[in-house]
Amino acid sequence: MNTIPKKNVDLIIPVYNEEEIIKHTHARICAVIDKLPYQFTLYYVNDGSNDRTSTLLNELNDSRINLIELSRNFGHQAALTAGIDASKAEIIISMDGDGQHPPEMLQEMIELVIQGYDIVQTQRIDKYQPSSLKKKTSSLFYKLINKMSNTKIVQGTADFRAMSRQAVDALKEMHEYHGVLRGMIAWTGFSTIILPYQPDERSGGVSKYSLRKMLSLATDAIFSFSLVPLYIGLSFGGLLLFLALAELTYVLSFWIRGETSTLAPGWSSLMFIILIVAGLQMILIGFIGVYIGYIFQEVKRRPVYLVKKD
């Protein structure tokens, strides 16, 4: 009797200093995938951990594990990219190694890809922290990026998603040094379904996503997917030209009426205008500088990540 070959599924799991919970996370994933009729490969991407994360992963002695060791900490997006580049399966699922992405959703995500969706994007629904600073700043980020860019990113989306081989191959064609995967995947336009989920509490360790890293991710997203900052500069320039024309018209009116003697010296107002113009120029030059900096880093063609070889 002919048997139908099992579909191959790759799990991409970036980890960074997760020695406290990595065994628990793996055991929980295995408790789910051991019951599913698919062939799994688990790509753990060690993003330059300086604790025992790598040692503990090797001790798991699971033949399905493929450990990718990065030479240093390149960041979450780079680690995800390393796993995606290494993947070969028909279905690829990325999830975090901190235990907050529930593996119990894997079966539903795989089934949706099999039904024909190229991207199954999860959406974080956090009911227990309605007033947290992280939630408010995250909401502000999504509102800004969706107003400033033609690429729409659903609020609350995470890097917990399933993708078809077609979507992954398209994503791998996008060689961006400052890549923001949730924006790049939305940009591809492949058939997508949103799957809400309630994040689990961390079973140990602390979040590695500091305020600095969140701001860096937001900056990458804004400057990678929008030219609005440049248009803001053009608008300010136009406004200043209009104000300069209005001032010129006002001064000329005194000359026409022969009332130049009534014009005040106006040293303070002149300095005020000079300072405003100079400040705006510095801001706008800064915007241009950021874009040039991004171009500079792209044209150098440095790899997004480096893999350590044994």
Regions picked out by a protein language model, each given a short descriptive name:
Residues E18-I21, S49, P102:
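Donor nucleotide-sugar binding loop of glycosyltransferases
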Residues M1-P5, V180-D310:
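Hydrophobic helical membrane-anchoring modules
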Residues I92:
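Short aromatic/hydrophobic "clamp" motif used to bind/position activated sugar donors
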Residues E18-I33:
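Short, well-formed alpha-helical segments that are part of the catalytic scaffolds
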Residues F40-Y44, S54-A86:
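Conserved donor nucleotide-binding strand/loop of the catalytic core
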Residues N8-D10, T41:
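Cell-envelope/extracellular polymer assembly enzymes that use nucleotide-activated donors
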Residues L70-R72, H76-A86, Q100-M184, D200-T219:
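Acceptor/aglycone-binding surface of glycosyltransferases and processive sugar-polymer synthases
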Residues N46-S54, G99-Q100:
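A conserved acidic beta->alpha catalytic loop
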